[in-house]
Amino acid sequence: SRLVSCFGAEQADDQLVANVNAAFGTDIVVQDFTNVMRNVRSRRIDTTKYVDCGTKNNLDLVQWAVSAYNAKWGYVMGTFGQVLTVDLLEAKLQQLPDAIGPYEDFIRANYLGVRTADCIGLIKGYSWYDTDTGEIRYGTNGMPDVGADQMYAQATEKGSMSTMPEIPGILVHAPGHIGIYIGNGYAIEAMGTKYGVVKTAVASRNWTGWCKNPYINYIEETEVEGI
């Protein structure tokens, strides 16, 4: 069909839009198309690479973080992976006016209809996510509503960055902030309102310590070979 012929392998949005406009005489704007597709991609949570949907574990936490990064999740203080609606944003503005108010225009322009999280919300959202229903259910699966510093304080296995083990799914911490180590020297973190969920080199950031998330199981990668 004409529509199918517009698609090509590893095709950029601008080329696809140009092909569709040429085939159908439309006048689709590339940025409008990109924004729509971003919202579609952001809403989907990819669990296809999870090793065990029945437990909350470090390897699936990594996959959760990678999915959030690939989907370009945004950042809104006090959120934990929900799709940002007008009602949710207004509720958060009332709850955290000083933290969110200065960024309200930016958030409305960039994140409505997109999944968002703050730094610790990215971690809590994984534990609260129900893989059967696709819902994020607050306070479930033994994960309390803690802050970044509380998470680090409550961890029983932790240390300075010089002692950090090579374990995907451990957490990296600095006062007031936390991220997810994904391996090979990189972490994924909800960095801030203007940045969203990003992938960063651990050595390039000012992390002060690491810890194991005390509310999930830790699986050695060798234990899941063949799954």
Model-predicted segments: where are they?
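Short, basic/aromatic beta-hairpin or loop at an interaction surface
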Residues: 132-153
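Short alpha-helix capping/helix-loop boundary micro-motifs
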Residues: 155-163
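Loop/turn positions that initiate beta-strands
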Residues: 167-170
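A conserved glycine-rich beta-strand in the N-terminal activation segment of trypsin-fold
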Residues: 178-182
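Active-site or metal-binding loop neighborhoods of secreted/extracellular toxin and effector enzymes
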Residues: 187-227
